[in-house]
């Protein structure tokens, strides 16, 4: 399994069934800590080992639009949706900081009583956040973005301190509204892009691939054209 995908999915190992977590008891703390440390070690190794694993690519010489540890496989081919991940010199520090903060958070809240729920939620949030940083597909980015909000909502609702129920309600309203607006934006980008940008096998001829859309936007801007063509100009 590719390294980036392994780091993302490691965070979800602790999210077993509630009954299994209850049987694990205090062990869930240790399991969560080990998983978070494994994610940190893998991420750190990816920085120092990039030139050996990726050949000539290095973090200091990456050009715009180039990614280390890039991996892509079909997810929903008919719609041009792929499980596509990669890291550049901007996203890697964010991923590393996330994997660094996970074990710090677990150690700092080690004595949390409801550990069977709390620690898996923390790992789920961390894994989804990493997915946001490494996603090279707009649909995949949106899915991971939504996955960060679910554990955050329950963490606020249960461990948010004073007036946490009101805070969780506001969090839900704001994030739900923002998610709908973001979804409308992604759908707009998808349907207003010219056909033919996608790989073979899609029904619509369109794509969610971020590098492809970025390259098309640069080419369109260089030619003095709007990124999404005349359709967007009519809307504006």
List each language-model region with its residue ranges.
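Hydrophobic residues within membrane-embedded alpha-helical segments of Major Facilitator Superfamily
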Residues: 5-8, 39, 94, 101, ...
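Membrane-interfacial alpha-helical segments at the cytosolic side of multi-pass membrane proteins
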Residues: 5, 98-106, 154-156, 185
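Conserved, non-catalytic sequence blocks in retroelement Pol enzymes and Pol-derived host proteins
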Residues: 112-114
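N-terminal amphipathic, basic-rich helices that act as targeting or association modules
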Residues: 1-15
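Transmembrane helix-loop-helix hairpins at membrane boundaries of multipass inner-membrane proteins
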Residues: 11-107, 116-120, 195, 200-231
């Amino acid at each position: 399994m590719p390294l980036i995908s392994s780091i993302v999915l490691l965070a979800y190992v602790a999210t077993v069934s509630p009954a299994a977590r209850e049987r694990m008891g205090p062990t869930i703390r240790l399991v969560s800590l080990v998983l978070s440390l494994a994610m940190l070690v893998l991420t750190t190794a990816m920085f120092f080992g990039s030139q050996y694993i990726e050949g000539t690519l290095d973090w200091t010489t990456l050009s715009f639009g180039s990614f280390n540890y890039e991996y892509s496989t079909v997810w929903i081919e008919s719609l041009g949706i792929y499980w596509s991940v990669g890291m550049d010199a901007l996203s890697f520090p964010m991923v590393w900081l996330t994997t660094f903060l996970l074990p710090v958070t677990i150690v700092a809240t080690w004595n949390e009583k409801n550990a069977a729920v709390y620690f898996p939620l923390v790992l789920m949030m961390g894994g989804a956040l990493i997915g946001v940083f490494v996603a090279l597909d707009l649909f995949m980015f949106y899915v991971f973005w939504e996955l960060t909000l679910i554990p955050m909502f329950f963490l606020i609702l249960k461990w948010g301190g004073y007036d946490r129920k009101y805070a969780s309600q506001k969090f839900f309203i704001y994030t739900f509204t923002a998610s709908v607006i973001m979804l409308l934006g992604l759908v707009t980008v998808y349907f207003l892009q010219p056909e033919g940008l996608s790989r073979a096998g899609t029904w619509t001829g369109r794509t969610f691939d971020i590098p492809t859309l970025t390259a098309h936007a640069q080419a369109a801007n260089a030619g003095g054209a709007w990124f999404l063509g005349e359709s967007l100009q009519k809307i504006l």
